[in-house]
Amino acid sequence: MLVARMQKMKAGNLSGMEKHNKRIFQNHSNPDIDTSLSDQNYDLMNREGKYKDIVTEIIESQKISQRATRKDAVLVSEWIITSDQAFFKNMDPNERDRFFQEATDWFKERYGEQNLAYAHVHLDETTPHMHLGVVPMRDGKLQAKNVFNREELRHLQDELPKHLREKGFEIDRGAEESERKHLSIPEYKKAMESVKELDVERQKKSQEIIKTVSQIDELQSAKSAL
């Protein structure tokens, strides 16, 4: 099953995302990252420079208005492209690389190669995945809401897996909810951790209830013995 999730990146998010995507850190809190494999990661766009400069260049080279870009504007719509571990298991590395290249080619064709800021493929985590950054420019304007409206999100969820199947990959469309709620990988992991915490909390409360019931039974037994 194809996983294609989007997150909106504003100016304040670019630096942190760049550090994550390029592995620019001395210490990290993600236990899923195996730093001994980080040198295998690569960027299919391979643009030089910092995200801020790359994105600014893409916007300024196309925009028709002289107005400054709003500080709260969505500068990048970042897509996380991946599948489950079963899809990648025993896959030839060349085929795996071709999978991400074909996905990138589809984005280039659909949204314009000039608007793709980066396409980082991560091979140093549990499941191979790609962070693909689209600067949502259209008709000389930065307009994330229009470029990725609900209709377009549905189109992407339908057509991207179709394209990949045509290229020889056995992959199905993602769940219907994919175009409604978009979670990044860290957000997904955080959500799963929250579920685990809730389960632990429920178990604790259940144990407390059982303990309380046992204490009541002991008191009643002691009272009956008097």
Please place each PLM-identified region on the residue numbering.
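N-terminal nicking endonuclease/strand-transfer module with a His-rich metal-binding environment
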Residues: M1-L226
